[in-house]
Design a protein with these regions (language model features):
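N-terminal cap/lid segment of alpha/beta-hydrolase-fold proteins
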Residues: 33-72
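Short, surface-exposed "cap/lid" segments of acyl-processing enzymes
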Residues: 69-73, 77-107
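Alpha/beta-hydrolase active-site loop
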Residues: 100, 132-154
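Primarily recognizes the serine-hydrolase "nucleophile elbow" in alpha/beta-hydrolase
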Residues: 145-203
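Mobile cap/lid helix-loop segments that gate and shape the active-site cleft of serine hydrolases
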Residues: 184-185, 198-229
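Short beta-strand/loop motif that positions the catalytic acidic residue
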Residues: 234, 240-242, 246
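Short alpha-helix in the alpha/beta-hydrolase fold that links the catalytic acid
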Residues: 236, 250-260
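Catalytic active-site module of serine/aspartate enzymes centered on a nucleophile-bearing elbow/loop
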Residues: 287-321
């Protein structure tokens, strides 16, 4: 049951989901058939099952949504998942109803943008070994392979590529953008602005920290990496989104990232804070109402059109100039 107070609408139910989203392993994430990722009947775009070879020799599998009836190459976007293993929809194994990346892809492709989303390495249909063994740098290389794939498609305008990253994905997007001038816009959702040890301390204070585990290469990088040093070098337009009830990354990190980007000389930065939204961009009050009304998980975990519209409006503006 959801519990309400004056400051935060919390729920053990939502808590369990978020813990799984952020900390669970790849075990149990199925290789779903292409039909699972097919658009709804009548959608003005197609969904194609695609394979992407990485420089390390891993085969990643994903879905490319492409607008129908195009007469010229269209802009393309790649979606970047957070720090836990997920399929291409950003779903954990036990809660496939959470499909934020499907929602984003649908909204963008309905408006003329091609979108590539991929199962994390070692998860779903993708190869590459255990996801937990991959460092942030290696994950960035996976996304670079996706960028190369998009640029090689005749349907895609290789000069109009954008990135949308959530959580760790919001660390990866700037890492790529500062080294690839073909990336012309990035969206950072719930992105950290401090080293990982500070994030871990915050999570411990909110009671959301995962179980202690032995240090691995991913954790070593996460603890030492300073996102602000990279943010200062970003030159493309940036949209920063954050929920003010984020239990994983403090909401003030949004403005810290924006300040760092502007400090580096890039003034094309937009910040949107969503009152009542958590790290997964779930509106907690709306989730409370839906659960009380007996709505299914697919409805409870659906991201509000408010968030989706902010993303799609901004991306369309920046990529179709």
């Amino acid at each position: 049951m959801l519990i309400t107070n004056n400051k935060l609408i919390a729920t053990r139910f939502i808590a369990l989901i978020l813990i799984l989203i952020l900390f669970m392993g790849c075990a149990g994430i199925p290789c779903s058939p292409p039909e699972y990722y097919a658009p709804e009947e009548g959608a003005p775009y197609i969904a194609e099952e695609v394979t992407v070879w990485t420089q390390a020799g891993h085969l990643l599998v994903g879905t490319l949504t492409i607008p129908k009836q195009i007469n010229q190459p269209v802009p393309g976007v790649i979606l970047i998942t957070g720090s836990s293993p997920q399929n291409r929809d950003h779903s954990p194994a036990d809660y496939p109803e959470y499909r934020i990346f499907r929602q984003i892809a649908d909204a963008l492709s309905q408006r003329g943008i091609a979108v590539l989303r991929m199962d994390d390495r070692g998860c779903g249909c993708s190869g590459g070994g255990p996801f937990k063994s991959a460092t942030t740098v290696e994950r960035a290389d996976d996304i670079r392979a996706g960028i190369t794939f998009l640029k090689d498609r005749v349907e895609i305008n290789s000069d109009r590529i954008g990135l949308i990253g959530h959580s760790e994905g919001a660390i990866i997007a700037p890492m790529i953008a500062v080294k690839d001038s073909s990336i012309i816009a990035i969206v950072l959702m719930a992105g950290p602005a401090t080293k990982g040890d500070t994030i871990a301390d915050f999570q411990k204070g909110t009671g959301w920290r995962g179980s202690a585990v032995s240090m691995n290469e991913w954790q070593e990088f996460f603890i030492e990496y300073d996102p602000l040093s990279t943010a200062e070098m970003v030159r493309c337009p940036v949209l920063i989104l954050h929920g003010d009830q984020d239990e994983k990354v403090p909401v003030e990190h949004a403005n810290r990232l924006a300040e760092a980007i502007r400090r580096g000389g890039n003034q094309d930065v937009t910040v949107e804070i969503f009152p009542g939204y958590n790290h997964a961009f779930i509106n907690l009050e709306e989730a409370n109402k839906k659960e009380k009304a007996g709505k299914p998980l697919s409805e409870i975990l659906k991201i509000s059109p408010v968030v989706i519209n902010v993303i799609s409006d901004w991306i369309v503006t920046k990529l179709t100039l």
